Amino acid sequence: MKLFQYNLIRFGLIINVEVTHMEYTKESIHQIVLNQRAFFNSGATLSIKFRKEQLKKLRKAILDNQEQLIQALHEDLGRCEAEAYFCDVGDVVMEINEYLHGLSRWAKPETHFSGLACFPSIFTKVYKMPYGVSLIISPFNFPVLLSIGVLAASIAGGNTAIIKASSKSKATTAALVDIIGKTFPPEYAIVIDGGHDIADYCLEERVDKIFYTGSPNVAKHVMEMASKNLTPVALELGGETGNWCIIRKDANLKDAARKIAFFKICNAGQVCININQVAVAEEVAEQFINELKAAIIKQIGEKGYLNEEYPKLITKRAYQNIADEAEQYRDRIVFGGEGNPETCKYSPTIIYPVDINESIVNHEIFGPLLPIVVYKDNEVDSLLNTIAEREHGLALYVFTKNKKWAKRVMQTQQYGGGCINEVCLHLMVKGVPFNGVGHSGMGAYHGIWGFREFTHPSTVLFGHTKMNLPLREHPYNKKKKNLLSKFLK
């Protein structure tokens, strides 16, 4: 048994927390929440100086242990070193840096003129207040970025944090338990391992903010549990009908194919903003398919599942689900369709043509299968109407030379974020939100948006003790009524 003691000299408070390496129970989870609430109520997390110190500790911990994390990501997901750093470790360091650079400015109280109606008050402040104890439930597909990146937002907001990491990404979760355990006392931040039962123990607790990343079905359960305590929730989901990519007949097909191939190879398609299906104009469909095949072959070879750099699916069950779905479309597989169940690697697979109403384009695939839907270019509005009628995706991508049309689509469709003539890079832009809508989520984070997600505004009017406003007091007369009507215009 390991005993942590955190001595808060400034507040005269000592908190003793016992943490064992045994499996968590309902009682031990409850005790962690109580200890974190006591720590938060001590006021220790409120100062900007403290928050920045913790963010720097977090950054140092990630950088000092990046080899351990990269190795764990390879073990869990088969990632090569470059992809592990680019998609997880490096990304999270960038995220922490953004919080460090902007926190003082974002956290500064806003000052507003109170207005004549509030005379003699002159000014009103809006304070950005932390929620308290935050619960972060992270997925397996980007187990560092989607846990530590959210933790950074929670820290920046002035909260404590409990991270329920995925039980599927075993090696990375074990590494995070070790790294965060060495970096922070558990009454401030802790990573918890375990299955659905442990997640439910966490959700049963009265925490102050929940941030969940995962599937819409589980998100409904999270919201149901959160509703019992009216706990505010942020959800980052993939969307039930996935993310569309639309290719017009005037698109640069070679460029589009190269980018789509890269993205579908990334993490073997296990990406919440990945392209779930492509809709390509029939006038250029065959040419696009040929370009896409060539792009995949150039990047990982004709048999991608044999390439050491190509990632694997997270579990044998995930592999089997992908293999089974591909088998249903065996007669329309024009590329790929092969894998190795022992390594859990399944090649990028093009399925063509697919009707827009078939099941494979009506759910999130979360793997390396890519169904291709064909439409007539002059009937693109019909395609857009069909997409709009379905559950909103986390991302939308369009490839075209017609920028005016592309902008119109991006301003009229419902989706989380997206790109014109590009894929996924909107995720990397500083200062912009990452979010979903409808079945792809609610709330937003990254940079200032993450700070906002983990804080709530509190408005405080500063009154005057030597002056008052008799106009608002009884008894009322015609003169007061006339003056009030002028003040309140």
Residue ranges of model-derived segments:
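N-terminal Rossmann-like NAD(P)+-binding subdomain of aldehyde/semialdehyde dehydrogenases
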Residues: 13-124
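Structural signal for hydrophobic packing residues in well-ordered secondary-structure cores
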Residues: 40, 44, 59-62, 66, ...
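ALDH superfamily catalytic-core signature
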Residues: 23, 184, 217-356, 378-381, ...
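Rossmann-like NAD(P) dinucleotide-binding subdomain of oxidoreductase/dehydrogenase enzymes
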Residues: 115-255
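Residue-level signal for inorganic ion chemistry
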Residues: 51, 96, 158, 189, ...
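Conserved C-terminal structural/oligomerization subdomain of aldehyde/semialdehyde dehydrogenase
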Residues: 23, 46-50, 246, 346-489
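Low-complexity, intrinsically disordered or signal/transmembrane-proximal segments
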Residues: 5-6
